[in-house]
Each structure stands twice: as structure tokens, then as C-alpha cells.
A protein has these predicted regions:
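Extended, charged/glycine-rich binding lobes that contact polyanionic ligands
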Residues: 1-46, 50-56, 64-190
């Protein structure tokens, strides 16, 4: 598979689960603060929105919002598919008030936050992960969390979870494209 380990420890498996999507929450950071605290300006070229999505892949969400707002959607990063995510998106309104200020449906929620002049300062993402496990693992999990916290940060892992697929074959499709084997690439996608 496409698993990745960033901490070299001889840890044995722990029987824990993450209830998806609610147990995996991602907040985009803007100027080192959660995007839920972001407020735009009274004027600007772009209308900024808070986008909340639940259990929907990024590109499906963007496509739906583009259809709704009838404008190209800009964003700073792709958020996880099987999660609850919060991020800022923005559309060019040439400074005009947007027709839609709030909207909710199909696992998506939009809220107009004001205007921005251009790209905002995306400083990272914050993850809230809720594990379900039996009490026997509490002390061990605390030790492991402390060990990971000592690292200060974890590198970004961009894999199949971003694209909402249960079949992690994007690396194989990429190889087929590089080799110019178009039919094989399509076969792996299908």
C-alpha cells in the first residue's frame, strides 16, 4: 500500500479506530489561525467564503460550488475526502456583492466572509483526530503522542485520501502516463 511511517519506533499495533468523517477534522490555517476565525474586508476583488465539507472529495465539492456560484473557485489546498474539512475559497466578483451569502446542502456548507484583494496567507492545516479505543491502550497512546509531539511537526502526506478513492493506484497511473502508455493508464483508472 501507500502507508508511510515518520517515527522510527518498534511500536506494535493498537486496536483503535477513527469514526469517519466526524473523527477526522481538518482546519485550514490563515495567518496561523483557524480559517473559521478569518474575516474578509468590506471591499476587494474576490468574495471569500468558508467552505465546510463532510465526507466529500475536494474536486466534487469545488465543482458543486462553481456551479452554484457560477464562477471559478480558487483555493489554497486540497483537503481530505473522508473527513470534515474547513477551508477558505474565493471567487472573482470584481468587487460586487455576491448573490449567495450562505448555502447548505449535500454535505457542503458555504458562508460569505467578506472580500480579499488576492491570495491569502495559507500557513498550514490543523488536524483533530478522535480515536476510539479501549482503556487498556490509554497510557501507550499518551506515550506515542508525546513522542510524535517531540518532532514538532509532521511532513505533509499527499496520497489517495485526498482524491476520495478506495483504490490507491494514482502512482501506477502516473507511471503509465510517464511511459506514454495511455491505454494502460485508463485501465488502471477504470
Amino acid at each position: 500500500g501507500m502507508e508511510r511511517y515518520y517515527v522510527e519506533e518498534p511500536w506494535s499495533p493498537i486496536n483503535a479506530t477513527i469514526k469517519r468523517p466526524e473523527g477526522f477534522v481538518v482546519y485550514e490555517e490563515v495567518d496561523w489561525k483557524p480559517c473559521t476565525e478569518f474575516r474578509g474586508e468590506p471591499v476587494g476583488r474576490y468574495a471569500a467564503y468558508l467552505l465546510e465539507k463532510r465526507g466529500i472529495d475536494h474536486f466534487t465539492a469545488v465543482s458543486k460550488v462553481q456551479s452554484l456560484l457560477r464562477r471559478k473557485v480558487n483555493y489554497a489546498g486540497i483537503k481530505d475526502a473522508n473527513a470534515v474539512t474547513y477551508q477558505i475559497i474565493y471567487v472573482d466578483t470584481s468587487g460586487k456583492e455576491p448573490e449567495i451569502k450562505e448555502w447548505e446542502g449535500n454535505g457542503l456548507r458555504l458562508k460569505f466572509l467578506g472580500f480579499i484583494k488576492g491570495k491569502y496567507n495559507h500557513t498550514g492545516n490543523v488536524f483533530e483526530i478522535t480515536l476510539d479505543f479501549s482503556d487498556e491502550y490509554t497510557d501507550e497512546l499518551r506515550r506515542r503522542i508525546a513522542r510524535v509531539a517531540d518532532l514538532g511537526r509532521l511532513p505533509a502526506f499527499i496520497g489517495y485520501q485526498r482524491f476520495g478513492t478506495r483504490r490507491p493506484t494514482t502512482h501506477v497511473v502516473g507511471k503509465m502516463l510517464v511511459l506514454r502508455e495511455w491505454c494502460n493508464a485508463v485501465d488502471f483508472i477504470l
